[in-house]
């Protein structure tokens, strides 16, 4: 991904996120160890907001894809 493409997916302001437990430290440890992370939970529980916050905090681009039970493989 070129810098021009990358920059359009950077989060330019700090998203509001209030940690509930130690999820930020756990994510940072997984990121440092290059371990994949899977977030699972019901609609509206904060998964997207959390990854937006972590992308901003780590200075990484973020591309989101909405997936649900109506989505097909084609």
From Swiss-Prot:
Which positions are annotated as binding ATP? Answer: 41-48
Specify whether Metal-binding is a keyword of the entry: no
Keywords of the record, alphabetical order, are:
ATP-binding, Nucleotide-binding
Which positions carry the signal peptide feature in this UniProt record?
none
InterPro entries to which the protein is assigned, alphabetical: ATPase_dyneun-rel_AAA, P-loop_NTPase
GO MF terms listed in the record are: ATP binding; ATP hydrolysis activity
Q: Return the Pfam families for the record.
A: AAA_5
Source superkingdom: Bacteria
Q: SUPFAM superfamilies annotated for this entry?
A: P-loop containing nucleoside triphosphate hydrolases (SSF52540)
Question: What does the function comment of this entry state?
Answer: May affect the post-translational activation and/or assembly of the oligomeric structure of RuBisCO.
| Family stated for the protein in its record | Belongs to the CbbQ/NirQ/NorQ/GpvN family.
Q: What is this protein called?
A: Protein CbbQ
This protein's species is Allochromatium vinosum (Chromatium vinosum)
